[in-house]
């Protein structure tokens, strides 16, 4: 096994072959089974691309809730014989993300290439990751942007990091949570800007709030913030000019009051179902953001970012997904991408029994939910209450426990 990781061509070749097999199998299942392999979102993407190819708006396709950039990227799917172009693009994006992970582990963490590749394989050879991308989920593209962002920050390429952060948030809203962690991580000591005179007078600095404020505003923080805002604003203004209010409505505003109770692991799913049916009244869809954002945008960055930026980003993402009012399997990729950075020093590796228990409970909790989902989707049985609701609570409880382990590891070990 050790020799495998000493030969990158074998690992990346295996990752590509795994995805190629799933692509071929997916085409066969789509043609021969009532249960389709291709994700319904991919049909939405390709329909939107077809509208764009005809000179129309991608938002002419109902339920297209994404940036027009995605429809533009998938324009080849409107050509004869190129329907699976997007799936191939997403699958290759997975592999590129894995390459960036290995590169970051060697350049910043000083790992040997074989050891870095071993941990990168947690992503590259993960069947869940390969399955989701080959079904037509675009998360692989986003994961490339996020890991490229992390690599750029760790290697002090601040302008590039700002561009990638702005592009990532434009592509999908949630990466904005990384902004506070990155800014907090970029302190004076890392930039080498704090003078010896400043270091010799901590008591004086503590009494001077204005000094702290000025010390916080460093060149790197300013550059990152302005570059990210300029990129995000430039893209949004351009898209608004092209597609007017439907762009803002479907890409951003829709998600503030989104009601989606199908394929939703969140404990909010039953409430969303009742809300969609008109059985309950209230604004809980918006209130659900409070614990989610408090944890992922405020508490975790302040507590963890200076200990470990990748660890803080993992904890932020895990908290964001766990507390999100909509939680689907695709969202798991958002935090799985950070596992190669967290695992080497984690308690899950130091205590294999704990690692196996965490993995088993995470999988079992999903399986119990999927069983109830099968009763609902395929057998037509009403399983929202108590089946799906209890399964969602169980999965939520498991994730809260895992989040506690991650936060503790990062705080104590700097994972």
UniProtKB/Swiss-Prot annotation:
It is found in: Endoplasmic reticulum membrane. GO terms for molecular function: alpha-1,4-mannosyltransferase activity; glycolipid mannosyltransferase activity. Pfam families: Mannosyl_trans. The chain crosses the membrane at residues 8-28, 82-102, 134-154, 158-178, 222-242, 284-304, 329-349, 354-374, 387-407. Its EC number is 2.4.1.-. Its main location: endoplasmic reticulum. This is GPI mannosyltransferase 1. It comes from Aspergillus oryzae (strain ATCC 42149 / RIB 40) (Yellow koji mold). The gene is gpi14.
